Curated annotation (Swiss-Prot):
Motif DEAD box: chain residues: 353-356
This protein's encoding gene: DDX59
Full protein name: Probable ATP-dependent RNA helicase DDX59
Pfam family, one: Helicase_C
Organism listed in the record: Homo sapiens (Human)
Residue ranges of the region described as Disordered: 57-98, 142-161
Length: 619
């Protein structure tokens, strides 16, 4: 049998309290045609249906309207008459009667329809009794093939390959390295660490002594060698230390916190035991996908996605299925907490991803309200591409004896990105963009173009397709969640040559296929600039970022010069000769000089005393 996600029972006065009435659904002609090719033993489905009926006749949990589990027991005819409701549907027998899944909803592992139920034997999502029977047959056949191909391994392998607990210990290879070798390694890789008694970085994932299943999943997902941030952050996280981490965009921060999350949740009995907070739906969906890839094959490891823009009832019900890891946006999770539909007292590790974006989007108080429901001894990890002063202040509030890990220079663009700054007046921007898209050396589809408004994104996308003939599409916050998900999928699969976007794609998303970014409109801050050009250069890949500037960005001229020029990029003469740049430079130098004068040193001590005496005498 399996556990239904949202099962409803009809009770009439004449019923015995145990019967189910099916909702009649007319199948689509396509479904009927597809079903002719299906070959499922009818007796398997019938047996499963009988089992479900027996299960329903006993005490069985169902979700109440408020999202809480309610016990359903046999009731008397009198009570049944009181509680009778309009006709409601039972467990679906055939997949053709099940609807297709909406974005973010669980998907049947057999046919891809809405995974309304969870198979109790495998914890996989299925849509009907038919697909459950198919799924169990597939599992059985796979097990038999595995035994035939390697009988000795099948006999020797224990049912549960995991130990009762996990404690990270430094690998003998790492222990045998000299201290100067470790320091040289950190220096060569650009790893800066601050904190007390910080463990050494790993050089290979196998140095963590992770379960074999997890090591296999890492390789399958393309993680061959850890990146610098992963080398230091993973062992520190596995030891349970609080962390404030900053690294270049695309440096592998997600996997760096997912491994400690998985290992912590794997050996915890309480559910949920891990929480990951992200500022946007798209980032949450991406993190859950990566988490599922790494968790595949690990026992009792389930995730739930709690984000706005997707139906709430399936999320509430999924919460009741003993999920280990919650991946959520602050607003949706706080709403669920206020409904008392989730308990976070068992959470042992919390990750706040893209923490600086959280603050800029006004989520700081929501994050703090959520963390008030977390135990005080919970491990906390703050992750971001940049660490402004506001993040430093938040870290001082949330973290206890933290380890600060920084790879690359704070708040600087990724070194793998070739940056080109062009002076382009507003009327000439479209023409310049079309020139870039027609340049064989620069044009490497798909190209991501950033603009500063939604209407501008739509109009520019239409112009690109009309003038250049390239397949172009726009994406922004006014597009529906389904549209945005399909556009993202199309971008990753190469369906679009140009995507024109507002800042919705500027943070956190791994767009591995993108090699060229054009900032059609200069972002409003250098932090946003860092994130937007960071859509290229992901995970060590090289890329190019072209930015159009003019006097509309005059307040950022000195910041652009300071941060971009050291990378070797040639800046346009209009920028270097701008009076705005020189004025900003002069003001900053005066500010620095004033700061130095305010510092009391042996050299200026007497001057400060004389100045103080003079000001007092004038009074």
């Amino acid at each position: 049998m399996f556990v239904p996600r949202s099962l409803k029972i009809k009770r009439n006065a004449n019923d015995d309290g145990k019967s189910c009435v099916a909702k009649i659904i007319k199948p689509d002609p396509e479904d009927l045609q597809l079903d002719k090719s299906r070959d499922v033993p009818v007796d398997a489905v019938a047996t499963e249906a009988a089992t479900i009926d027996r299960h329903i006749s006993e005490s069985c949990p169902f979700p109440s309207p408020g999202g809480q589990l309610a016990e359903v027991h046999s009731v008397s005819p009198e009570q049944g008459a009181k509680d009778s409701h309009p006709s409601e549907e039972p467990v679906k027998s055939f997949s053709k009667t099940q609807r297709w899944a909406e974005p973010g909803e669980p998907i049947c592992v057999v046919c891809g329809r809405y995974g309304e139920y969870i198979c109790d034997k495998t914890d996989e999502d299925v849509c009907s009794l038919e697909c459950k029977a198919k799924h169990l047959l597939q599992v059985k056949e796979k097990e038999e093939k595995s035994k035939l191909s390697n009988p000795q391994k099948a006999d020797s392998e224990p049912e549960s390959p995991l130990n009762a607990s996990y404690v990270y210990k430094e690998h003998p290879f790492i222990l045998n390295l000299q201290e100067d070798q470790i320091e040289n390694l950190k220096q060569q890789l650009g790893i800066l660490v601050q904190g007390q008694e910080v463990t050494r970085p790993i050089i290979d994932f196998e140095h963590c002594s992770l379960p074999e299943v997890l090591n296999h999943n890492l390789k399958k997902s393309g993680y061959e060698v850890p990146t610098p941030i992963q080398m230091q952050m993973i062992p520190v996280g596995l030891l349970g230390r609080d962390i404030l981490a900053s690294a270049d965009t695309g440096s592998g921060k997600t996997a760096a916190f997912l491994l400690p999350v998985i290992m912590r949740a794997l050996f915890e009995s309480k559910t949920p035991s891990a929480l990951i907070l992200t500022p946007t739906r798209e980032l949450a969906i991406q993190i859950e996908r990566q988490a599922k890839e790494l968790m595949s094959g690990l026992p009792r490891m389930k995730t739930v996605l709690l984000v706005g823009g997707l139906p709430l009832p399936p999320q509430l019900y999924r919460l009741q299925q003993h999920v280990k890891v919650i991946i959520a946006t602050p607003g949706r999770l706080l709403d669920i907490i206020k409904q008392s539909s989730v308990e976070l007292c068992g959470v042992k590790i919390v990750v706040v991803d893209e923490a600086d974006t959280m603050l800029k989007m006004g989520f700081q108080q929501q994050v703090l309200d959520i963390l008030e429901n977390i135990p005080n001894d919970c491990q906390t990890i703050l992750v971001s591409a940049t660490i402004p002063t506001s993040i430093e202040q938040l870290a001082s509030q949330l973290l206890h004896n933290p380890v600060r890990i920084i790879t690359g220079e704070k708040n600087l663009p990724c070194a793998n990105v070739r940056q080109i700054i062009l002076w382009v007046e507003d009327p000439a921007k479209k023409k310049k963009l079309f020139e870039i898209l027609n340049d064989k050396k620069l044009f490497k589809p798909p190209v991501l173009v950033f603009v500063d408004c939604k209407l501008g994104a739509d109009l520019l996308s239409e112009a690109v397709q009309k003038i250049t003939g390239l397949k172009s599409i726009s994406i922004h916050s006014e597009k529906s969640q389904i549209e945005r998900k399909n556009i993202l999928k199309g971008l990753l699969e190469g369906d679009y040559e140009v995507v024109v976007s507002t800042g919705v794609l500027g943070r956190g998303l791994d767009l591995i296929s993108v090699r060229l970014v054009v900032n059609f409109d200069m972002p409003s801050s250098m932090d946003e600039y860092v994130h937007q050009i960071g859509r290229v250069g992901r995970l060590g890949q090289n890329g190019t970022a072209i930015t159009f500037i003019n006097n509309n960005s005059k307040r950022l001229f000195w910041d652009i010069a300071k941060r971009v020029k050291p990378t070797g990029s040639i800046l346009p003469p209009q920028l270097l000769n701008s009076p705005y740049l020189h004025d900003q430079k002069r003001k900053e130098q005066q500010k620095d000089k004033q700061t130095q004068n305010d510092l009391v040193t042996g050299a200026n001590l007497m001057d400060i005393i004389r100045k103080h005496d003079k000001s007092n005498s004038q009074k």
